[in-house]
A protein has these predicted regions:
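Soluble metallo-hydrolase cores and metallopeptidase-like ectodomains found primarily
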Residues: 44-105
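Hard-cation-handling environments
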Residues: 252-469
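Bacterial N-terminal signal peptides
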Residues: 10-21
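Catalytic centers of hydrolytic enzymes
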Residues: 427, 432, 437-441, 448-453, ...
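Structural recognition of the beta-strand scaffold that forms the well-ordered cores
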Residues: 64, 81-83, 102-106, 142-145, ...
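Active-site/substrate-binding loop(s) of hydrolase catalytic cores
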Residues: 96-269, 273-278
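Acidic/histidine-rich, surface-exposed loop or edge segments in extracytoplasmic proteins
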Residues: 27-38, 105-107, 209, 427-434
């Protein structure tokens, strides 16, 4: 009996010591922003030192360098850091415990959206040596805490190439986005989140889920019903306002394409609200297209240093509550995502007229929900000092004790807005059956290299071969006004042709994880594909045969795997 009591006391003391040790370490290891008392943004060199300390104290953490920024006249290359935090101390995908879901967090693709980065560093600390360490029993974490070191240093949206990283997820011109996709395809997490900041907003945290119709609708429904509902509930307990992420855009303008519109082309006075973009060029749908539970988080922001602490806190709890929700539903998430991924590959092995890929779509109204009521800030004529605890009549004496603090900026009052131009739905307007594969002429090596950047498997013909292919003849084409936009109109006639496929031409089978992405990138009518970027020189003339062919025969081809030794 004495031995049992002694053992219990010993175990309790041991647990307490471990817990106290973790708390002490988390309090000792401060993020760079905490060190400066949130008077400065964390920079790459400071982040490196912070991660070194985390790596030293946390055997569960592995830090890797996954790339470098490009060198410019005023900026030397900076490392891109990647944190793997797992209970098993995994250093590569084969070491992951796949019984748990894996969560990839990408922060601050836009350099001036600083709180996402600061919150990611807090999350790393609390997972590695702090109070969130128990989460590692149920969830694997992959974190890119600063995706745009250049933009962060100069507090600007774009990177050192003057590229908007969150519009580069199709053409992959930046080393930063190439690194993101390499990490995603190497580890294939079930859940991802891309973290940003929006403008000043009543809603401190907004989270959006997948929205492209080529992504299975079950993922969107599960995201909203099972995850976002729980995140909203937990944020509310913290006094943090939440709404699913909404976008305001001028009607007739694609605000998510990455276009730098001329002022005269942005004169539409009518605006609409919708959920986040259907485009595949961002850090959410570009990963969601692999049947991933993919999210975007937008924290409210004035983009000033004075509010950095509170903005970081809002973002942190958004990350934390989403991670806790995933961890609590891990088995269901693993089953859902993996089943959809396997089903997509199996479907792509067989040509079926009813197996459609959606190429063009539009935002649409919902008859059941013709309008939406949201809360907004409206500038107040006089500063708001507080809120009355109890209503008072005009002329009643008022003291400070009669007021509770006003939870919003004093220059704003909260008003309700009824949005009439509300477009919550997405409707496909151009769809085609997915072929078994595509044939790309050797002359379009740039297309092939970009697809390799997406980790799409490509094969090369080892000999000339006569084949029956499906080709598009262009009947009408109206080019876009801007780079990054698809042709305003492109009509095609599909024809079956006999052609000689040349030795050195390329073949891409759709029977792989990127099945839907492949068609979206290569089809001429796609609003998401390579045709929208001038760099690929794919805009045809009327009467032309589009140079990328469809292949729908179940036939053995003289091909071998292709690798680019330039990479």
């Amino acid at each position: 009996m004495f031995y049992r009591k002694s053992l219990k006391i010993f175990l309790c003391l041991s647990f307490c010591l471990v817990f106290i040790s973790l708390i002490a370490q988390s309090e000792t290891i401060k993020t760079p922003a905490e060190e400066s008392k949130y008077t400065q943004y964390s920079q790459n060199e400071e982040i490196a030192r912070f991660l070194s300390r985390i790596d030293n104290y946390s055997p569960e953490t592995t830090i890797q360098i996954i790339g470098k920024t490009k060198e410019t006249k005023n900026y030397k290359p900076k490392d891109l850091y990647f944190c793997i935090i797992t209970e098993e101390a995994a250093g590569c995908p084969s070491e992951l415990n796949r019984e748990k879901p894996t969560f990839l967090l990408i922060a601050s693709q836009h350099g001036n959206e600083q709180s996402a980065k600061e919150a990611a560093l807090l999350l790393i600390r609390d997972l590695a040596v702090g109070e969130l360490k128990p989460l590692l029993k149920r969830l694997n974490f992959l974190i890119i805490p600063q995706a745009n070191p250049y933009g962060s240093q100069f507090d600007q949206r774009r990177n050192e190439q003057d590229l908007d990283l969150n519009r580069d997820h199709v053409k992959l011109e930046s080393p930063e986005v190439k690194a993101i996709h390499r990490i995603f395809r190497t580890w294939m997490p079930e859940v991802t989140m891309d973290a940003h900041e929006k403008g000043e907003s009543y809603y401190k945290v907004s989270v959006g889920c997948v929205s492209n119709p080529n992504i299975h609708p079950t993922l969107q429904k599960f995201s909203r019903d099972a995850i976002l509902a729980e995140v909203e509930k937990n944020l509310k307990k913290k006094g943090i306002t939440f709404q699913e992420y909404l976008v305001t855009q001028q009607i007739g303008i694609d605000s998510s394409a990455g276009v730098r519109y001329r002022p005269e082309d942005q004169r539409s006075e009518e605006e609409m609200k919708r959920f986040s973009t259907t485009d595949l060029n961002d850090g959410r749908n570009s990963l969601g297209i692999y049947e991933t539970l993919s999210f975007i988080q937008e924290g409210a922001s004035r983009h000033d240093i004075q509010t950095l602490r509170e903005r970081t806190e809002w973002q942190y709890f958004g990350f934390r509550f989403l991670a806790e929700s995933i961890a609590g539903q891990g088995e269901k998430i693993n089953s859902l995502v993996r089943e959809l991924r396997e089903r997509l590959i199996e479907k792509a092995k067989v040509y079926a007229e009813q197996d459609l890929v959606h190429l063009r779509m539009k935002y649409a109204r919902d008859e059941k929900e013709p309008e939406i009521v949201i809360k907004n800030f409206e500038r107040s004529e006089i500063p708001i000092r507080g809120v009355l605890k109890v209503d008072k009549k005009a002329g009643d004496f008022l003291t400070r004790d009669d007021l509770v603090s006003y939870p919003y900026p004093s220059q704003y009052k909260v008003v309700e807005e009824t949005v009439k131009n509300w477009f919550p739905n997405v409707e496909a307007i151009v769809s085609v059956p997915r072929p078994l594969g595509y044939i790309i002429p050797a002359s379009h090596q740039d297309v092939v290299e970009t697809m390799l950047g997406h980790d799409i498997k490509i094969e090369i013909f080892t000999q000339d071969r006569p084949l029956e292919i499906e080709a598009y003849q262009i009947s009408t084409v109206v080019p876009a006004k801007y780079d990054y936009l698809p042709p305003q109109r492109i009509d095609v006639e599909k024809k079956k042709l006999q052609t000689i496929v040349k030795r050195g031409d390329f073949y891409i089978s759709c029977a792989q994880a990127s099945a839907n992405l492949i068609s979206c990138l290569l089809e001429p009518q796609s609003q998401y594909g390579f045709i929208r970027y001038l760099k690929f020189n794919l805009i045809p003339e009327e009467g032309d045969i589009f140079p990328i062919f469809r292949f729908a025969e179940k036939k053995e081809l003289p091909v071998i795997p292709y690798k680019s030794w330039k990479r």
